[in-house]
């Protein structure tokens, strides 16, 4: 799939959405914080909003071109859309909601046949029920099925997991993956959920304040953020200004206050950098670290322990604020307490340097 979004200019309440990007992957995540303009961009692709300037092309079909006045109606775009509120009809049964989305005609792709769709999403037992009697996860699957029954060329998903609790999210993600693999339909998925983006998307477009901050393969964006804003969005718990004092054999020595770290040298020549470290890449050790391949071994003191579900966020003073994410059993085995001295270990490739 090729989706070209060019010369997009849409004034919003607090900023102007301004986008120029082309996506070619099967599943692309529009990723970023709430209120960044992600849903507005999705609405433009669906034809639900008009912009003073926009050129939108899906493969070889121009859907919107404000320069020529072309605007293909929403119903003729060949797009399935699952909005965040799902937009199911509460006065209709599940079957009636599904039939509302069915595409008629002899040229329907067998992949999108009614029986096949409800089988893949496992909603046959729900067919006769009222949508008001469904759980959040069941409603999500019905909304996905209705969008697929329109036999779309592109599927738009707006925060498909946002309204679900963690157990339900874990149940819905496999269905989204099944849609990706079974129907092989291009998907554009708006999300601010890291797990959702990492699990489903081939490419990520990071948007903040109405602008594209970075776009590219998912792992590349998550592992090599282009700037501090992207680093925060993709989950770099530690983000500190530093200075490169030496580069040798592809390794950079970085100084943060009086603390020295070894990292992979950035491709761009820069001395002033932001040091980005994920919490899960920081290991903790009670005794002083013995000889190992880990280059960064920092004496630190525990400032706070903050439980986060199955994990504990450990706030450290290592000469600079450093954050570690460890499991609850790991925290218990180390008998961690506030004020304790600890050694933090960070492998060289886990320290990402972003020019500032």
Task: Describe the function of each predicted region.
Residues 46:
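Helix-to-loop junction immediately C-terminal to a conserved catalytic motif
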Residues 54-66:
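Conserved ABC transporter NBD signature motif
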Residues 29, 71-73, 77-87, 188:
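ABC nucleotide-binding domain signature
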Residues 50, 258-309, 323-356:
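Glycine/charge-rich catalytic "coupling/switch" loops of P-loop NTPases
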Residues 63-80, 104, 221, 225:
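ABC ATPase NBD coupling module
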Residues 33-37:
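Walker A (P-loop) phosphate-binding loop of ABC-type ATPase nucleotide-binding domains
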Residues 84, 93-229:
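ABC ATPase nucleotide-binding domains
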Residues 39-42, 142:
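ABC ATPase nucleotide-binding domain helices that frame the ATP-binding cleft
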């Amino acid at each position: 799939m090729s989706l070209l979004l060019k010369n997009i200019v849409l004034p919003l309440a607090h900023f102007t959405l301004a986008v120029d990007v082309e996506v070619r992957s099967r599943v692309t995540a529009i990723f970023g914080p709430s209120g960044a303009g992600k849903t507005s961009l999705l609405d433009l692709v669906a034809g639900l909003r008009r912009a003073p300037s926009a050129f939108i092309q899906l493969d070889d079909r121009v859907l919107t071109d404000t320069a020529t006045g072309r605007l293909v109606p929403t119903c003729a775009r060949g797009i399935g859309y699952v909005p965040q509120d799902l937009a199911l009809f509460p006065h209709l049964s599940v079957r009636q909601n599904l039939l509302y989305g069915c595409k008629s005609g002899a040229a329907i792709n067998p992949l999108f046949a009614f029986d096949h769709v409800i089988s893949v999403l496992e909603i046959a037992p729900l067919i006769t029920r009222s949508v008001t009697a469904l759980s959040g996860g069941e409603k999500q699957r019905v909304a996905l099925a209705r969008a697929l029954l329109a036999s779309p060329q592109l599927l738009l998903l707006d925060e498909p997991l946002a309204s679900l609790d963690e157990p339900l999210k874990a149940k819905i993600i496999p269905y989204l993956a099944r849609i990706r693999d079974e129907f092989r339909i291009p998907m554009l998925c708006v999300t601010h959920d890291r797990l959702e983006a990492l699990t489903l998307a081939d490419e990520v477009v990071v948007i903040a304040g109405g602008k594209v901050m970075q776009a590219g393969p998912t792992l590349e964006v998550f592992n090599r953020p282009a700037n501090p804003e992207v680093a925060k969005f993709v989950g770099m718990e530690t983000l500190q200004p530093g200075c490169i004092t030496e580069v040798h054999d592809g390794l950079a020595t970085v100084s943060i206050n009086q603390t020295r770290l070894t990292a992979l040298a950035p491709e761009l020549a820069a001395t002033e950098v932001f040091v980005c470290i994920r919490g899960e890449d920081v290991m903790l050790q009670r005794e002083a670290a013995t000889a190992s391949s880990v280059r960064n071994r920092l004496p630190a003191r525990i400032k706070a322990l903050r439980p986060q579900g199955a994990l504990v966020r450990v706030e450290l003073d290592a000469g600079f604020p450093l954050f570690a994410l460890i499991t609850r059993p790991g925290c218990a085995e180390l008998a961690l307490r506030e004020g304790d001295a600890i050694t933090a270990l960070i492998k060289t490739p886990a320290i990402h340097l972003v020019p500032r």
